[in-house]
Every structure is written in structure tokens, then in C-alpha cells.
């Protein structure tokens, strides 16, 4: 256990569940920054179509999210290759589901409602962040009994 976690554990209301949410927000924040900065670079610097930029941002942020969530948020231990494969395929499968939601909301906001690309990306990230937490907490990284 890290020294920071030991200090935080001295706070009476700081439970494992609070820690999990706190760490998810921290790692989710980094993941969101990676996603938005990658999207911004691809759309505003490279002048790529927002759908391509969104896909590249998705790939970069999901790779970061898998390893950071596994280690720092859910402290997931998978002893066998079968467990690792199940966990990884579940993670990437649910992230593909939220990517579909992400791209559909982006198309709706940008193409039909004329929302600025960067603002649309920020709003879709909020939706995806909540969905990803729910999927990760209760399905992907659930504690094995």
C-alpha cells in the first residue's frame, strides 16, 4: 500500500469505495486529457476529419485507461492467462460499445446540431466517462469471489 493511501486511510470516511471513485476520477482525468488533446491535435493541427480524429483519440486513451484502471483504480489481479484474456477482452469490448455511443453523439452534436467539435468532444467524454466507470466497476474489474 502506498504512503499516500496510508495517509488517506486515516480519514474516517475514506473507504475502499471512495478510494476507487477518487482514483477513477484521477485516472479518468488523465484519460480524458489524452483523449481531448489527441482529438485537438488531429482536428486543429493536422486538419483531419473529426471522425478519424475521434477514432485515433479513442485508441490512445483506451490503451492508457486499461493499464491505469487495472493497476491504480481497481487493483485487479489476474493470475492466469485465461483471466487476463477475459478481463482484457471485456474491457476492450465495452470500450468499443462506448466508442459507438461516443461517435454517434459526436455526429449528432456536430453534423445535426452544429456544436463546435471540441465542445462536442468534451460533452461526449462526460457521457463516456460515466458509462465506462459503471462497466468497469460492476462487470470488467469486479472482484472474483
Curated annotation (Swiss-Prot):
The protein's role, per its UniProt record:
Involved in the decoration of cell wall teichoic acid with galactose and glucose.
Q: Which GO terms describe its cellular component?
A: plasma membrane
Q: Which InterPro entries match?
A: GtrA_CellWall_Glycosyl (IPR051401), GtrA_DPMS_TM (IPR007267)
Q: What is the official name of this protein in its record?
A: Cell wall teichoic acid glycosylation protein GtcA
Q: How does it sit in the membrane?
A: Multi-pass membrane protein
- Pfam families per the record? GtrA_DPMS_TM (PF04138)
User: What are the alphabetically sorted keywords of the record?
Assistant: Cell membrane, Membrane, Transmembrane, Transmembrane helix, Transport
Q: Which family is annotated?
A: Belongs to the GtrA family.
Q: Does the keyword field hold DNA repair?
A: no
Q: GO terms for biological process? A: polysaccharide biosynthetic process
- Keyword Isomerase in the entry? The reply is no
Please list every transmembrane segment annotated in the UniProt record, as residue ranges. Answer: 21-41, 45-65, 91-111, 122-142
Query: Where does it live in the cell?
Result: Cell membrane
Amino acid at each position: 500500500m502506498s504512503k499516500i493511501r496510508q495517509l488517506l486511510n486515516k480519514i474516517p470516511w475514506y473507504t475502499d469505495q471512495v478510494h476507487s471513485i477518487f482514483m477513477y476520477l484521477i485516472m479518468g482525468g488523465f484519460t480524458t486529457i489524452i483523449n481531448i488533446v489527441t482529438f485537438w491535435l488531429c482536428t486543429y493541427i493536422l486538419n483531419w476529419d473529426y471522425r478519424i480524429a475521434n477514432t485515433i483519440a479513442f485508441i490512445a486513451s483506451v490503451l492508457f485507461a486499461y493499464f491505469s484502471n487495472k493497476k491504480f483504480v481497481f487493483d485487479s489481479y489476474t493470475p492466469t492467462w485465461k483471466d487476463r484474456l477475459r478481463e482484457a477482452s471485456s474491457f476492450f469490448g465495452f470500450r468499443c460499445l462506448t466508442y459507438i455511443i461516443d461517435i454517434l453523439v459526436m455526429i449528432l452534436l456536430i453534423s445535426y446540431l452544429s456544436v463546435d467539435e471540441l465542445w462536442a468532444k468534451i460533452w461526449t467524454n462526460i457521457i463516456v466517462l460515466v458509462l465506462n466507470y459503471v462497466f468497469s466497476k460492476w462487470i470488467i474489474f469486479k472482484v472474483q469471489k
